[in-house]
Amino acid sequence: MSEYKPRIADGILREKLEAIGAVLVEGPKACGKTTTAEQQAKSVLYMNDPMRRMQYMQMVETDINTLLDGAVPRLIDEWQTAPQFWDAIRFTVDHRDGDGQFILTGSAVPVINNGQIEHTGTGRFGWVKMRPMSLWESGESNGGVSLSELFESPESIGATSTLSLSQLA
């Protein structure tokens, strides 16, 4: 397995965990949600584990709190396969002391108030939106040009790149 490359989202996730009970990390498939969350999680539940998936789904229906037990922050990966996690985590956050209890990751987010999720999560959940790695995160750019600087003062931007156009594409 390759070495973890730090992401901009690492700091954002850390800040959210220090401020709220649960954090939902969302974004497209394969953008690094699980890997990023694993860096800060103290325990992990992989809902898509083929050897345990059926057992986990039965536990969701009979004793979901057992699945929530573990060192915090506890990562629930692919949580959307069992939307019941949302209300169970909201309830747990309300009745435990402390921020940074849960990290939820998944590519799809169920609709609130669809019969499976009863509460919006306001005040209990924070969100981190992830995107695929930027060129700077992947090491393909030195960060000499930033989009925010480009919009703030386009006349003062000046940098060169060793990458060819085909390498950037």
Question: At which residue positions do the language-model features occur?
Answer:
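N-terminal pre-Walker A segment at the start of P-loop NTPase domains
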Residues: 1-14
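Hydrophobic anchor at the beta1->P-loop junction of P-loop NTPases
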Residues: 25
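Conserved lysine of the Walker
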Residues: 33-34
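Short glycine-rich substrate-engagement loop in P-loop NTPases that contacts/grips substrate
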Residues: 44-73
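Structural recognition of the conserved hydrophobic beta-strand(s) that form the central parallel beta-sheet
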Residues: 75-76, 101-107, 129, 138
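Conserved catalytic/switch belt of AAA+ P-loop NTPases
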Residues: 86-110, 118-119
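Interdomain motor-coupling "hinge/lid" segment immediately C-terminal to the ATP-binding subdomain
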Residues: 114-169
